[in-house]
Swiss-Prot record:
ATP binds at residues 8, 11, 91, 137, 140. Transmembrane segments: none annotated. The keyword NAD does not apply. InterPro entries: CCA_bact (IPR012006), HD/PDEase_dom (IPR003607), HD_domain (IPR006674), NT_sf (IPR043519), PolA_pol_head_dom (IPR002646), PolyA_RNA-bd (IPR032828), tRNA_CCA-adding_enzyme (IPR050124). This is Multifunctional CCA protein. Its EC number is 2.7.7.72, 3.1.3.-, 3.1.4.-. One of its GO terms (molecular function) is tRNA binding. SUPFAM superfamilies: Nucleotidyltransferase (SSF81301), Poly A polymerase C-terminal region-like (SSF81891).
Amino acid sequence: MKIYLVGGAVRDALLGLPVKDKDWVVVGATPQEMLDAGYQQVGRDFPVFLHPQTHEEYALARTERKSGSGYTGFTCYAAPDVTLEADLQRRDLTINALARDDDGQIIDPWHGRRDLEARLLRHVSPAFGEDPLRVLRVARFAARYAHLSFRIADDTLALMREMTAAGELEHLTPERVWKETENALTTRNPQVYFQVLRDCGALRVLFPEIDALFGVPAPAKWHPEIDTGVHTLMTLSMAAMLSPQLDVRFATLCHDLGKGLTPKNLWPRHHGHGPAGVKLVEQLCQRLRVPNDLRDLAKLVAEFHDLIHTFPILQPKTIVKLFDAIDAWRKPQRVEQIALTSEADVRGRTGFEASDYPQGRWLREAWQVAQAVPTKEVVEAGFKGIAIREELTKRRIAAVACWKEKRCPKPAN
């Protein structure tokens, strides 16, 4: 029995990055030998075991053979005669087909170290094309390592295009698509994930609402980048710089979906695109089974982001109604989230990346003022039932009006 550290832990160590999870491959062992050594079996489809002390995963070396459609249609063979090299050959990318033995020696039969140095994401073998999930995984790796200047090898990208054109991605379950997307959205450059999907044709298949934005023009005065799809990826990049929060990034990605519905004869203007996009956000989230909290914020951002941009001319009554509409009294975090997504929208434009966004500050300040109006005083004044809410709203509007007069400059005529 020989044990090797494999995959991401070896890759990230060679890149000088923190190693989070360790996966191990065991060569020359049977399931019974693993159980006798105190390991706990957890794998159903193939033998995977948990170490009795570290609880890290130890998998018996195995090979895989395509036996059906999609990413689950594989027959696995795990036995003591499976070599380390055979196990590494079934992996997706050469940089993931690396192993390290007890002496610290790197086993690299597929030239993963060479591709690490060249900053290349390259598939190990033609078997890559048998698993459609790998299209998304490569896109996610491209996003994860974009700051290190990694790129996808030309032949790998060509294979991803072939897989997409062959309809392989249609076999992916919504849960797997969302899981890969969720992980990509938390990387330093999530926009790269969606750009790669577009480059290989997968964006049109998996995210048609986003793909539809490319080629849709916006007024050059406000959007020097012109293309709404380009703007969407720029705003996502900006959101990633402004916040690590998944919900902020996802809502930013979806903020302009309504522009994909604008009739061509009305281009480049998109009046009412915010509210129009709400149903597309709902459609996308329902299809991919996006968590409800992310969906709800994305719908609010789609509906109200343009309103935030006009904050200096908003009436105090409108501002308080906005807080009602986003349910800020029960979910105060939404004020900050919407401020950040609106800022990402404005700064996610060519030439505006370093712009100040005072509307975000004013939104936060107005919220603090409205929130500070005490409910207790309204109750003590004798108001009852629905009259409490009505009086509280009046006082909040008055407080915001007083603040706005002092702190929020009126736009020049």
